[in-house]
């Protein structure tokens, strides 16, 4: 099982996340979304739900590594489809070791 340390909670829209190695971009319905700084290609984010952890590729939204329960994966993909530009921008910031910007949760 993979365990990641918890990063700081999301802040108000327009805020910038601190310089932790794996800042938390978003949290909703018990799902936590992270992005490493920097990380290996292809561009992706990490989703954690309880004991489950998965790497999700940007664009295709395919699971690269790990797993999530089916309902959780559907919610993560629904959220990611709403925020492709923000995810891509955060990936670029992460690779440049710049602070990341939080993304709104799934409502």
Q: Which stretches of residues belong to each language-model region?
A:
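Basic nucleic-acid-binding interfaces
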Residues: 1-5, 9-107
């Amino acid at each position: 099982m993979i365990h990641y340390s918890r990063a700081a909670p999301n802040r108000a829209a327009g805020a910038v996340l601190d310089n932790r190695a794996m800042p938390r971009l978003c949290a909703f319905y018990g799902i936590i979304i992270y992005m490493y700084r920097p990380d290996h290609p292809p561009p992706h984010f990490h989703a954690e739900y309880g004991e489950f952890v998965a790497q999700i590729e940007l664009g295709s939204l395919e699971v690269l590594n790990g797993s999530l329960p089916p309902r959780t994966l559907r919610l993560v993909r629904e959220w990611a489809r709403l925020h492709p530009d923000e995810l891509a921008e955060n990936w670029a910031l992460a690779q440049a070791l710049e602070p990341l910007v939080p993304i709104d949760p799934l409502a």
